[in-house]
């Protein structure tokens, strides 16, 4: 049923792919799942803290590929990457700030 499918799809995308809420919601809508069911499952599985932690983990793996680029360009590319993966601009900005402040 749709409930079980939504739950398993969401867990796979969160744990394996490290996708953000926006990307997951978009993919589930394309599969024909109702908005209220998507929102219910997203609220149960993902908080802003979890979302930030996943984005940070994803960014740590990606940031090495930007070596040799200037910092501003690297930050822009990393934030665009995170937003394509479904993270909000606020989370992408915060992750980039934290990643590049570490350096």
Residue ranges and their predicted role:
Residues 1-103:
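An alpha-helical, amphipathic repeat domain used for nucleic-acid recognition
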């Amino acid at each position: 049923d749709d409930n079980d499918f939504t739950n398993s799809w969401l867990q796979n995308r969160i744990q394996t792919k490290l996708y953000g809420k926006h990307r997951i919601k978009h993919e589930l809508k394309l599969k024909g799942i109702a908005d209220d069911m998507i929102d219910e499952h997203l609220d149960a599985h993902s908080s802003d803290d979890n979302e930030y932690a996943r984005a940070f983990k994803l960014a740590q793996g990606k940031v090495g590929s930007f070596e040799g680029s200037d910092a501003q360009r690297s930050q822009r590319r990393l934030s665009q990457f995170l937003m394509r993966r479904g993270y909000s601009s606020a989370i992408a900005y915060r992750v980039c700030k934290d990643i590049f402040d570490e350096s």
